[in-house]
Amino acid sequence: MLEKDRFLEKINFFIVIIFVFFSTELNGENIVSKVLKYNNNLHNTSALFIQSNSESVEEGVIYFGKERIKINYLKPRKLTIIISEKKGVYIDHDLQESQYFNTNKSYASVFFKIFNNNNPLEIPNVNISDSLIEINEEVEIDETVYKITFIYENNPIILRKIIINENKESFELGLFGHENLKSLTKKFFSMVDPYLN
């Protein structure tokens, strides 16, 4: 009889462990689904940002469209970066120059993987606490490894910071002042060189 009680006790212990594991797993998956829904609802929104690295601090506004992201740097230099899944443009307003680039060959591709994703199972590296949600992605381009972290406030879910690490270099983009905008047109996200004559 004593042997049977010990056996039942062990079984109950394992059932509790399995229940806790799966409920935590489901809760985590539920939060990731909410983050992905939030990301998909970023269309027609903007946020102010402060970007910093070991050498400088820059300020600006980031705009999220349905298929493109536009980043306007306002201080100390006036720059614009517009990216889509396949291409991007870097515009230096002081020099009145534009450079085009392939986003598939840059870490910008990670932004579209995170912001346009609907499948929580494709976001494997997530850390969840009471106050924060971190999504970590890694991409290798031309033998350089980029580690990108998206940090969200947990309740309510709001994107607060993006950290990009490349070897020993890193920069952080702190986001605040989020706004819903009525409509951002295709023209607003145009990649046509504004200084073409």
Located regions from the model:
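Short, solvent-exposed coil/turn segments at beta-strand boundaries
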Residues: N41, Y63-I69, I83-K87, S129-D130, ...
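Bacterial N-terminal signal peptides that target proteins for export
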Residues: E3-F14
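A charged amphipathic helix-loop-strand protein-protein interaction module that recurs
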Residues: N104-I123
